[in-house]
């Protein structure tokens, strides 16, 4: 048996408590890296979209509460931008779902809360891009499901993904109809 004086033991105990506190306060390791990288991919894509928009004369500030698509501009760029953004955002939501599932048994409330915080933060630039009530979708889902549990995070992610898929489909179909007048709703549902 290893002999240990009180001071060493107390220091080891403090260190163990500190490490446990740090772990319980948020995401760590590969999970943190994956989710933060995925969230950054969204902001990078939105920045690229806004840069492209400026070059094409599209004014995102012209968005109104209910007019955030082709009603604001005849230019299909806005529709394309939303399709691009929702594609990247859905990858982020899938990453959240996978990581929450991995941590279902061993994760802490701090880790799940950090996942929710990331989802909420990511919803802001998506909303500024014209995806209506994205932050409300995420926060409303958190009111119905505890964001400090794996199941709560999975339910919030599900609501977020459903919203993204609806927006993606709507904008994709509208874009295809503008490109090809023979493109029907039925064809859209099958794509």
Curated annotation (Swiss-Prot):
Q: Which UniProt keywords apply?
A: Plasmid, Signal
* Result after altering residue 52 to K: In strain: 297, LP7 and Sh-2-82
Xref: InterPro entries:
Decorin-bd (IPR003332), Decorin-db_sf (IPR038353), Decorin_bind_prot_A (IPR054923)
Signal sequence region: 1-29
Q: Name one Pfam family in it.
A: Decorin_bind
For this record, the Gene Ontology CC terms, alphabetical, are: membrane
According to the UniProt record, what happens if one changes residue 128 to E?
In strain: 297, LP7 and Sh-2-82
Coiled-coil residue windows: none
Q: What does this protein do?
A: Binds to decorin which may mediate the adherence of B.burgdorferi to collagen fibers in skin and other tissues.
- Which family would the database say this protein is a member of? Belongs to the decorin-binding protein family.
Instruction: From the Swiss-Prot or TrEMBL record, give the protein name.
Output: Decorin-binding protein A
Chain's gene name: dbpA
